[in-house]
């Protein structure tokens, strides 16, 4: 998949702010283990912490659950953090070669310093100028809980929608490693094609209800 230019990154950020209320966010990052049959003479290289053999799909997704970048083929035993640092996307981000827009002020904070455009990720990823991790679990406010919840929702939805459509991902996939990578890349492209053909999904009401559920849960917990 081609790396977006600055105009497309800004379009992605605008949609993220519209749908998820995360200004300057240009995507969410996560890794997914794709179950495979153990390649010959591979030892434990593909054996992951979940107890099966896999290759890692490292992906970024936009606000609507469409993939922006994909990297496929890292050993299943590697952590998301390590895969991120070694994959093409991670290398481009770490070297500031993703063509991200220049820092800009957040909405209603025009007097504050300009803020970087960023990706959201979980605790397995490094905290960088352009990568935001969840707030630590201790002493979370309602606002922080909602941010943590929303952070990786779009990429998780992308993985879920893709897996529900393409049963080959239930695995184990029994091809040569190179063919497996080709199949996974093709599935990601088809996922995006179907997503565009079907139209963008709109989930503000779902988000609002989930946010309310989180707030109610916190109120109950606080009163126990």
Q: Model-found features: residue ranges?
A:
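Short, well-ordered secondary-structure "scaffold" segments embedded in the functional core
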Residues: 1-224
């Amino acid at each position: 998949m081609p790396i977006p230019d600055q105009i497309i990154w800004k379009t992605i950020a605008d949609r993220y702010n519209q749908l998820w209320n995360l200004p300057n966010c240009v995507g969410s990052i996560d890794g997914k283990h794709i179950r495979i049959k153990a390649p010959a003479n591979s030892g434990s290289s593909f054996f992951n912490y979940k107890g099966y053999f896999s290759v890692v799909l490292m992906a970024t997704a936009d606000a609507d659950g469409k993939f922006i970048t994909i990297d496929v083929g890292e050993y299943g035993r590697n952590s998301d953090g390590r895969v991120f640092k070694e994959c093409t996307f991670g290398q481009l981000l770490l070297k500031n070669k993703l063509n991200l827009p220049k820092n800009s002020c957040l909405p209603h904070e025009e007097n504050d310093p300009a803020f970087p455009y960023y990706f959201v990720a979980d605790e397995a990823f490094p905290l960088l100028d352009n990568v935001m991790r969840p707030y630590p679990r201790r002493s979370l406010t309602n606002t922080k809980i909602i941010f943590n919840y929303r952070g990786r929702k779009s990429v998780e939805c992308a993985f879920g929608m893709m897996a529900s459509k393409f049963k080959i991902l239930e695995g184990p996939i029994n091809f040569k490693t190179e063919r497996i990578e080709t199949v996974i890349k093709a599935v990601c492209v088809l996922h995006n094609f179907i997503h565009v053909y079907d139209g963008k999904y709109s989930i503000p009401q779902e988000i609002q209800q989930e946010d309310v559920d989180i707030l109610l849960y916190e109120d109950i917990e606080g009163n126990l």
